[in-house]
From Swiss-Prot:
Cellular location(s): Cytoplasm; Membrane, Clathrin-coated pit; Cell junction, Focal adhesion; Cell projection, Axon
Lineage: Eukaryota, Metazoa, Chordata, Craniata, Vertebrata
Outcome, altering S61A: No effect on catalytic activity
Chain intervals for the UniProt region annotation (Disordered): 196-235, 252-284, 306-402
Effect of C120 to A/S: Strong reduction in microtubule acetylation
UniProt protein name: Alpha-tubulin N-acetyltransferase 1
Organism: Homo sapiens
Basic and acidic residues biased stretches: 226-235, 355-367
Oligomer status and interactors: Component of the BBSome complex. Interacts with AP2 alpha-adaptins, including AP2A2, but not with AP1 gamma-adaptin (AP1G1/AP1G2); this interaction is required for efficient alpha-tubulin acetylation, hence clathrin-coated pits are sites of microtubule acetylation.
Length: 421
């Protein structure tokens, strides 16, 4: 490959090694600084043209080797020139090979993943006019000696069929290890330990300081033992104790504030797994008898007394209080009941109280008649007012008082004979 400038003046050696800085070789005596800047521009032109020729030979859509990529990556290029051919005394370029270290994940013979950082063949090109003349072997062998590696320790990026035949012919590399990426490795790749890339100057300083400093390293921190997977449960009973919320009982049992106390023993797994982690097991409700007893103990409101005096059998409180009474007493408490005479069929205490009430009423009426006969001359008047019952005693809201028994209901029925229908 020919160029319009002098290649021999640019590359004094047959094989020239260039890194990412693209600096020209040692300056010849008598060269000036502007001339050196022009030499670097010429090197960039050579690399760009070699990359285009390689992409065309491999049928690639874009070149993979260029001066800009060389400056942004830590790759090395080996350039081979033809010193014998001197067209117009300027020399020519035969080919090049680009290598670099890359971190790869490759599979071994047992299909196990391995993280390695081998030296990779990234691009290799020899001009078509000088192929099969030993130039490729010469360039490849020089690179192996310079990098101090063996052919089977290399990883090749997207090799062409010509390159695979070249390696099989000169280095007996035929059996490959299948990979999931675009790199190809050969049998024996894992037989030797790969040489890591050249350490930087900063890493070398740190390594030297560590070798000189006799301070012992800090002991490694011990990690807690890992729990066995068999002990792990999705929702364990012990982990959910703090999530349980006490269920508030119904009114009126929720007057006194209650604090939710955690249970002494966690519930069994059968009962705990049936509930949500945010809700605990529901508490049983209070029986109806206890609820009615608590209602009787509650002091009434003053307006309830007036309502009871106006409508003794129709107030909701009276209906709640007589819910547990026998049917006979319930019928007697209603104004429209037809069971007014039922007072001796039931042997309970309600019927006994009703009998005592009737007897006291008769005694009161007899005493009033005697008092009227003693007043005046002793003759009965023609028109006398009907005897009025004395004012009932003051109603007392006490447990077991007259207001809750059948006698009080009977007295109310005698004073009020009006029927709702």
């Amino acid at each position: 490959m020919e160029f319009p400038f002098d290649v021999d003046a640019l590359f004094p050696e047959r094989i020239t090694v260039l890194d990412q800085h693209l600096r020209p070789p040692a300056r010849r005596p008598g060269t000036t600084t502007p001339a050196r800047v022009d030499l670097q521009q010429q090197i960039m032109t050579i690399i760009d043209e070699l990359g285009k020729a390689s992409a065309k030979a491999q049928n690639l859509s874009a070149p993979i080797t260029s001066a800009s990529r060389m400056q942004s990556n830590r790759h090395v290029v080996y350039i081979l020139k033809d010193s014998s051919a001197r067209p117009a005394g300027k020399g020519a370029i035969i080919g090049f090979i680009k290598v670099g270290y890359k971190k790869l994940f490759v599979l071994d013979d047992r299909e196990a993943h391995n993280e390695v950082e081998p030296l990779c063949i990234l691009d290799f090109y020899i001009h078509e006019s000088v192929q099969r003349h030993g130039h490729g072997r010469e360039l490849f062998q020089y690179m192996l000696q310079k990098e101090r590696v063996e052919p089977h320790q290399l990883a090749i990026d997207r090799p062409s069929q010509k390159l695979l035949k070249f390696l099989n012919k000169h280095y007996n590399l035929e059996t490959t290890v299948p990979q999931v990426n675009n790199f190809v490795i050969f049998e024996g790749f894992f037989a030797h330990q790969h040489r890591p890339p050249a350490p930087s100057l900063r890493a070398t300083r740190h390594s030297r300081a560590a070798a000189v400093d006799p301070t012992p390293a800090a002991p490694a921190r011990k990690l807690p033992p890992k729990r066995a997977e068999g002990d792990i449960k999705p929702y364990s009973s012990s982990d959910r104790e703090f999530l349980k919320v006490a269920v508030e009982p119904p009114w009126p049992l929720n007057r006194a504030p209650r604090r939710a106390t955690p249970p002494a023993h966690p519930p069994p797994r059968s009962s705990s797994l049936g509930n949500s982690p945010e809700r605990g097991p529901l508490r049983p409700f209070v029986p109806e008898q206890e609820l009615l007893r608590s209602l009787r103990l509650c002091p009434p409101h003053p307006t309830a007394r007036l309502l009871l005096a106006a409508d003794p059998g129709g107030s909701p409180a009276q209906r709640r209080r007589t819910r547990g009474t026998p049917p006979g007493l319930v019928a007697q408490s209603c104004c429209y009941s037809r069971h007014g005479g039922v007072n001796s069929s039931s042997p309970n205490t309600g019927n006994q109280d009703s009998k005592q009430g009737e007897q006291e009423t008769k005694n009161r009426s007899a005493s009033e008649e005697q008092a009227l006969s003693q007043d005046g001359s002793g003759e009965k008047p023609m028109h006398t007012a009907p005897p009025q019952a004395p004012a009932p005693p003051a109603q007392s809201w006490t447990v077991g008082g007259d207001i809750l028994n059948a006698r009080f209901i009977r007295n109310l029925q005698e004073r009020r004979s009006t029927r709702p229908w």
